[in-house]
Amino acid sequence: MLKYTVKRLLQSLVTIFLIATAVFLMMRCLPTDYYFTEEQLMKFTDQQKTAALEAAGLTDPIHTQLIKFYNDLLHLDFGTSRRIQNGAPVVKVIGKKFGVSMRLGLTASAISLVLGVLMGILQAAFKDKVFDWIGTAYTVFVNAVPSLVSYSLVLVLGSKYLGFPTLYSTRNVSASSVLPITCLSLASIAGYALWTRRYMVDELTRDYIKLARVKGLSSREIMFKHVLRNAMVPMVQYIPQSILLTVGGSLLMERFFSVPGMGPLIESSFC
């Protein structure tokens, strides 16, 4: 197990190295105007632009720039912002936004895990009955409808009938976080419910479940002490992936609800 874990970690490091190098090289292929704001492009002369590029080390040989890039990376020096907040450390710029996205993402992940597993348990317990049909319809709806449409429905229902704020506000964080967290949770709840139902239904067909029923164990004991425990084993592998997707998939949601998180920052960094 240890050997396998170390092997996978090394493979991950190699993958990260290759991706980082590819991104670095692609950034260096961009026109030099990209490194200046619109205001700087209008004011700077060609000599001033050249001097600024030299000061940033962007005129050095590409291998020298790459070595410096990884050296700075190892020292957690991500440089300074040139387009978002000119001259501000990148770590500081990200730090202001990262906390907001992380809080919403982790809260949504926790809620979706609890509600999704609970829904999957009920669907498996009442297989081919009304609750199972409702859960299946919800899963199909969430996966079939574009995110923008489902977000709009949440916005209308939540603001008109429940009175929640339509935009994120730092003055009223708790109330204004409800609708963004709900939107982030929709897909994850459906995913957890689908996985839980699938594995629990598979477990219910095992011979040991039939033996447990013959021994007189109640349906509740069978469901929670045996079926759920065994069904969670293969499902655990999906939890980290789901959390990463929930936390990282907030670009549209943050733009939709004007959340000052990583989403708008990532978007503006490419514009």
Enumerate the predicted regions with their spans.
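Residue-level signal for discrete positions within transmembrane alpha-helices
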Residues: 12, 97, 101, 137-144
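An internal, D/E-rich "acidic patch" concept
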Residues: 58-117
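Alpha-helical transmembrane segments of integral membrane proteins
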Residues: 2-3, 98-131, 147, 171-271
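Membrane-water interface segments at the C-terminal ends of transmembrane alpha-helices
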Residues: 23-30, 71, 137-165, 185
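Generic alpha-helical transmembrane segments of integral inner-membrane proteins
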Residues: 9, 13-26, 106, 110-118, ...
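Hydrophobic alpha-helical transmembrane segments of membrane transport/permease proteins
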Residues: 16-67, 161-173
